[in-house]
Amino acid sequence: MADEEIRQKALAFIEALGGSDNIKEIEGCITRLRGTLADPAKVDVAKLSKLKIVGRPMLMGDGIQIVVGTHAELIGTEINNILRGQ
């Protein structure tokens, strides 16, 4: 996956997760994005589904896990770069 494609995917995940203010923490781990959200109700499951995730996102309290495939670590890193203004 090209750098620009990773960036666009990361931006789409940020939007689907309720925006940058809703993401407290996120990381990529092998095939999953794992994170903590300020308000899980802001997650747009329909938007996540359009991002070709595997199955449904798993919401547990304020935590979320999303199976995204082998690019999870790249996407997670890029989400964090965007959240830090890079």
Where are these regions (language model features)?
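Membrane-embedded alpha-helical signal segments
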Residues: 3-86
